[in-house]
A protein has these predicted regions:
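Short amphipathic helix-loop junctions that connect adjacent transmembrane helices
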Residues: 28-43, 223-239
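Cytoplasmic helix-loop-helix junction between adjacent transmembrane helices
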Residues: 102-139
């Protein structure tokens, strides 16, 4: 990538990672601390965690379409303002119901598709997988930092303070958006059945289903992996970053050669199939093995190599396949599929665990 493309990829990844850092910080603390809210029940705590994915899925397509019509930058600012409003609602309440409402607003700022469309608009086709991999790396860094920072902030200033911190991060993301060049709409089109048909070709639907399945596996897996760590006494909950941090770092080292082979030697299909095979192998090992620290770390690394490779390749394939004028809408459908996969994966994974046992969830993900 040239200097201009690298700068754009850096800014987009920074916006995405700052926003995702705010969201990820809730994961290790929400279920523990939310029981202190008024009217708190396990169901409402679950709603506070999961409703974000539902509203994200619902608003991805409208945001993608509107960005095709009015440009990417105005929609990015609008989405971050909505996200900020949701953070403020959640920060200024002692009632779990208003936390749920605040989280719903956070999800309503659905800018993921708009950001990826902006990146695709600004980076040449040959460099899109590299740019997507860079964005994925930054999100991975944000995830690892969140596992450490989230519990520290919450232990000092509570969940309310954490939501204020998340709101502050959304302001930081907005400042970065203001530094982006205005992206003018390529073409105006009416949101019609015909427009949707253009984004529902066999190739695009296959990519949508692929990202749905990928995030279904991720959500289902992360219901049980922390529990398996505790069950097998691999590390304490406070120290689980000792597994996640090296696994993510090693996985990015393993992912880079796969992306280079995919792009430089035009072997995208083979790398995609290899990554899917690695994904299946990781789920089989989780299902059948007696887990200790080393086995868990190696298996988790294989899982992240596969997941991150597929996560980088799919948006690149989508941007090549979708028509430029409908790219925002296509990215919206793609992101909707991703968030629906997360929500449904969490719901089904939790149901299987409730009815059967932990390992049965991996049996489910093997066949997905």
């Amino acid at each position: 990538m040239g200097a201009t493309e690298r700068l754009i990829a850096f800014k987009v990844s920074l916006i995405m990672s700052v926003r995702m850092l705010g969201l990820f910080m809730l994961f290790p603390v929400m279920s523990v601390y939310a029981s202190g809210y008024e009217n708190s029940t396990p169901f409402l705590i679950g709603m506070a965690i999961g409703i974000y994915g539902l509203t994200q899925a619902f608003f991805q397509i409208p945001f993608g379409y509107l960005s095709d019509r009015f440009g990417r930058k105005p929609l990015l600012i609008a989405g971050l303002l909505i996200f900020f409003l949701g953070s403020i609602i959640a920060a200024n309440t002692e009632n779990i119901i208003f936390v749920v409402i605040g989280r719903a607003f956070q999800g309503g700022g659905a800018i993921s598709a708009v950001l990826m469309a902006f990146l695709a608009d600004s980076v040449s086709e040959d460099n899109r997988a590299k740019a997507n991999a860079f964005v994925g790396f930054q999100i991975g860094v944000a995830f690892m930092l969140s596992l450490i920072i989230g519990p520290i902030i919450t232990s000092k200033i509570g969940l309310s303070g954490l939501f204020w911190s998340i709101g502050l991060l959304s302001i930081v993301a907005m400042l970065i958006v203001f530094s982006l060049k205005q992206s003018k709409p390529i073409n105006y089109y009416r949101l019609s059945i015909g427009a949707f048909k253009e984004t529902l070709s066999r190739e695009l639907v296959t990519l949508d289903f692929s990202v749905f399945s990928l995030h279904l596996i991720l959500a289902s897996g992360f219901i049980v992996m922390p529990l398996l760590i505790m069950k097998n006494q691999i590390v304490s909950m406070a120290d689980n970053w000792q597994l996640y941090l090296p696994a993510v770092l090693f996985s990015f080292i393993g992912m880079v050669p796969l992306i280079i082979i995919s792009e430089k030697f035009k072997k995208t299909k083979y790398i995609l199939l290899l990554s899917i095979l690695l994904l299946i192998i990781s789920q089989i090992v989780f299902f059948i093995s007696d887990l200790n620290f080393s086995v868990f770390l190696i298996t988790l690394t294989i899982f992240f190599v596969a997941f991150n490779s597929v996560e980088a390749i799919l948006p690149s394939l989508l941007s090549r396949t979708a028509s430029p004028s409908k790219r925002g809408l296509a990215m919206g459908i793609f992101s909707t599929s991703q968030f629906l996969g997360t929500f449904i994966g969490g719901a089904i994974g939790g149901l299987i665990y409730d009815i059967y046992d932990l390992n049965s969830v991996f049996l489910f993900t093997i066949f997905v």
